[in-house]
Amino acid sequence: MKEDCSPSSHVPISDSKFILKSELLSLLKTYNCYHEGRSFQLRHREEEGTLIIEGLLNIAWGLRRPIRLQMQDDRERVHLPSATWVPERLSYLQKDASPQDSKVPAEEPSTQPANKGEVSRDGSGPLQEEEEEVPQLMRTKSDASCIIQRRCKSRAPGEAQKIRRHRFSINGHFYNHKTSVFTPAYGSVTNVRVNSTMTTQQVLTLLLNKFRVEDGPSEFALYTVHESGEQTKLKDCEYPLISRILHGPCEKIVKIFLMEADLSEEVPHDVAQYIKFEMPVLDSFVEKLKEEEEREIIKLTMKFQALRLTMQQRLEQLVEAK
């Protein structure tokens, strides 16, 4: 790894560190051999002399505090009751419907007034065309279908609006608002598709957007955690995918964790080597260190006492010589 190198022959690791392109490609080959036949193999290409690597990056959850998810789901549709809905229509349709009506395909266009309460899931606002047409026609195919439609339509506007506000999704699943705050299982792994030009902050933003987390990327950090317990924070200017390749493909040895920025700290190698020991063993280490410290103190004390004695004797000799 060198500094201030030509971009044609080197690839940046951070804003000030570089690695030889040939060396990185060799590590990439090893990485892909490890993941052979799996979706975690990485692809690479060159654009204007710049090497770009892309693929899936595994990130483990290492949060201690709960996170809050966005309450709105852009893809959810909520049907609000129509202002022109009359409950008596149900009995009217059941009474006057002919046997042929029960065979009408569900895809036929409706002829009822528009239901203006339908909300788009994609966040683009109300569906304009559906506001001008009837979203659903009360069918007489079965009594059950009519009852279902009636239940859907009979909600008060305030109740339906409350349901719409109190639902959200994560990974396509809808949850009640009471579960919008949760803590992912420690060590559970997710992944995002990234490339080697994406910085730590960009990867964090991508991951949080994927799970619709309300908290901003500044509240989190990415750490490389070694099997030994050594823990190193990825700087904002670093590239997580490059870091993953440099640490090797085996996640039993090194994992990339998402952690809180204010609750996590780096653990150097000198400290990490003691992490896995039990408390009695650590206590014995401390006792031995104290004993060694006492011996060193005694040794230094005796040394300086001897030096002081020598200096005093010399001073006395000089005084007598005068």
Swiss-Prot record:
Annotated region described as Disordered, given as residue ranges: 96-140
Q: What residue ranges carry the coiled-coil annotation?
A: none
Swiss-Prot/TrEMBL GO biological process terms? signal transduction
Enumerate the PROSITE patterns for this protein: RA, SARAH
Sequence ranges assigned to domain Ras-associating in this UniProt record: 175-263
Q: Which domain of life is it from?
A: Eukaryota
Q: Residue limits of the SARAH domain?
A: 271-318
Q: Which UniProt keywords apply?
A: Cell cycle, Phosphoprotein, Tumor suppressor
Role, per record: Potential tumor suppressor. May act as a KRAS effector protein. May promote apoptosis and cell cycle arrest.
Q: How does it assemble?
A: Interacts directly with activated KRAS in a GTP-dependent manner.
Q: What is this protein called?
A: Ras association domain-containing protein 4
Q: Which gene encodes it?
A: Rassf4
